[in-house]
Amino acid sequence: MMFRVTSVGCLLLVIVFLNLVVPTSACRAEGTYCENDSQCCLNECCWGGCGHPCRHPGKRSKLQEFFRQR
């Protein structure tokens, strides 16, 4: 009887431990706020948001932004 109680206790401890580990290692999905690459699931933090691939503005988008400001 003592062996069965110990096994159940160990099983419950393992379940509790797994529930504690999962939330601490969760990564952030694409489009959510981030501060560095390690926070994102795709390891790409671009200008405060998780994204893949990291999109850099080209000449066309810079030109459109220039005309929007005028």
Swiss-Prot record:
Leader sequence range is: 1-26
Any idea which UniProt keywords this protein has? Answer: Amidation, Cleavage on pair of basic residues, Disulfide bond, Gamma-carboxyglutamic acid, Hydroxylation, Ion channel impairing toxin, Neurotoxin, Potassium channel impairing toxin, Secreted, Signal, Toxin
| Keyword Cell cycle carried by entry | no
Per the UniProt entry, the propeptide covers 61-70
The answer, when asked if Chaperone is one of the entry's keywords, is no
Q: Write down which residues bear the modification named 4-hydroxyproline.
A: 53
User: Domain remarks in the entry?
Assistant: The cysteine framework is XI (C-C-CC-CC-C-C).
Q: What is the name listed in the Swiss-Prot or TrEMBL entry for this protein? A: Kappa-conotoxin BtX
Organism, per UniProt?
Conus betulinus (Beech cone)
